C-alpha cells in the first residue's frame, strides 16, 4: 500500500512556496498574516469589521451587480441567496481566481475552488459568521496561449493536445469570441471521450453552457456555477461594466502614485532577493500597474513623471487626460498582475485569498502596494493539490510495487529497479552453468556405456548437441517471455508516468476536470470536497 499524501519538493515549486508551506518564519516580513495560525483569520476579520464601520465598502452596488451578472448563467436559488448574504455587513469572503480556460482550464483551477469552499466552511464555523467563496475570473489577461488548450491521454498512453486559435493579438481573453471554435474542439474531443460512462451527461452540459456563452470567461463562469452553485460559490468577471465602475478609485489611485507603484515593487523585490529568494513578478520598467485599451488592444501603461505611455504603441498620454478618460469610461483601464489583488480586496471583504505556488511568490512582492492603497492584505492561503488516481493506474502501481512518491521523487531509480526485478536471472549464465553440469554428467554417462561398446563415443558429440539445442530453445523461450514482460512493463510505466507526472509536471497542470467528470460523474468532486483540508501535501484521491 502506498502513501495517500505526498510532500512537495523543489521540483514542484519555488523556494518561496516551499518555505511558505514548511518554514514560514523567514517569510513573515513579506506577509501580514500567517495561514498557519488560527488567530490570523480572527485578526483579518477584525480589520474587516473596522473597515465596515468606516463604510469603506460597496455592498449594495456589489450585490446588485452580482445579481445581474449571475442571471445570465443560472437560476439556482442557492446562488441568489448567497449573493444576498453579501448585504450583511458581517459577511466575509474567501477569494480565489484564475484565467478562464477551456472547460475551466487545468485541474488546479478546480482545486482552487474546492479549497475556497472548504476553507469558507471552516471559517464560517470558527468565526460564527457567513463566509462566502468567490471565484475571480481573470478575464483581462491577454495571453491567449496560456488558456487555449486542453490535454488528455489516449488508451495507448499518448498525450493528446486540443487547441483553439485566435489571431486577435493583444486582446483580452474576455474580449475574444470563441464559441464556434470551442464547439469544434468539443466535437474533436468526443472521439476520445465518447466511450466514457457519463460522456452524454457532461458533454451535454459543456455544450449547453458554451451555447449561452460568447467568451471563455462566460463559459468558465457558467460551468463553475453548474458545478459549485449549490456550494455557495459566486463568480466575478472584473471586465463587466458594473465592476469596472466600482474599480475607479483603485485605478485613480494608481495614476496618482505614478512611479511610486513600480518603485514599491522594486523595493520589495530587492528585500526578497536579499533573503535569497527570487521574485515571481518581472515587470516592464516603469509600469504603472495599469493597462489601457486602445482599439481593443490591451497595452501596458508606463509612467515617467506625469507622462504616461502606451508602451507597445508609442502613444503618449498626460495624467490629466487619463483621469478624464477614467471618469467617463473606466472600461478603458485594466489592472496588471500586481494591482488586481489590491482591486479584488478593495471590492470584497476578503478574509483570505486561495493562492497557487506562483501567486504566493508574487504576493511576497506586494506588501508595500497594499500599504500604499491602505488596504490590508488578507491571509494568503495555499490552494490544495490532489493526485487523481484512476483504477488502471492504481493497478499498475500495485503490480510493480510503486507509489506516487516514487514517480515524483526518484523515477529513474524506480524504473531500473522494476526492470531489474523483472529479470531475477541471467539466462545466458544459467544456460552455460546448466550445460557445464549436464556435459559433465553426459561424459560420465557415455563413459559407462562405453564399457558395453566403445563405438558409443561416435554418438557423444551429436547427442550432446541435441541436448544443448533443447536447452537453448528453453533459454530463448525464457528470453522471449522476458522481452514481452519488459515491453509490457515499459508500456505500464510510461502510462502511469504520463497520467501521474506528465512531462515532469504535476497532473493538475496538464489535465482537465471534464475528462474525469465524463468517467466518474460528480463523484470526483464529492471526493475532493470530503478530503480533509490540507494544502501542505498532495492528497492522493482514489477514484475507484
Curated annotation (Swiss-Prot):
Gene Ontology molecular-function annotations: ligase activity
Instruction: Give the EC number(s) under which this enzyme is classified.
Output: 6.-.-.-
Q: Which residues form a coiled coil?
A: 431-463
Q: Which UniProt keywords apply?
A: Coiled coil, Ligase
Q: Does the keyword Coiled coil apply?
A: yes
Pfam families recorded: CC_BshC, Rossmann-like_BshC
What this protein is called in its record is Putative cysteine ligase BshC
**UniProt xrefs under InterPro entries:** Bacillithiol_biosynth_BshC, CC_BshC, Rossmann-like_BshC
